[in-house]
């Protein structure tokens, strides 16, 4: 994904205005905090955490936005040998339209560009949509664990090497 790209898969929900994938900017912080709250409720990141990942150069934050409305975001820490996808949030009204798949494909491409051999992420065990998306894209459960009273799964995808995809 380029820094700025028009997003086309069924993106015109209420208007003909296209959604665009681009890097997050500091001006997006209120929208990112709100998107995180809508998607993750009590487990949402603090405004300070969002400020850090948007401003710090080692993090990559990609948003899909229609005008000023941020409808999805991913937060990636590209590194080798393993890259971590720290968050992938899609507003409920934009789910099942290819938005999450676009952000996941972008994360995979960025991890490969960082020479990572693995891409890892964590997902709640009671989030079948996210688990299904990740499985379809080649992720497998590496471990299950209890965190803050919720069962979660670490999922990983091998990106290259002798047995990689």
Protein language model annotation of sequence segments:
Residues 1-14, 152-165:
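Terminal substrate-recognition subdomain of acyl/acetyltransferases
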Residues 3-8, 23-93, 104-106, 110, ...:
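Acetyl-CoA-dependent GNAT
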Residues 90, 124-125:
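Short amphipathic helical patch at the helix-1/turn junction of helix-turn-helix
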Residues 98-100:
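Conserved G/P- and acidic residue-centered "switch" motifs that form tight phosphate/ATP-binding loops
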Residues 104, 127-130, 147-152:
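Short glycine/proline-centered loop/turn elements that form peptide/ligand docking sites
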Residues 114, 132, 136-137:
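Structural motif
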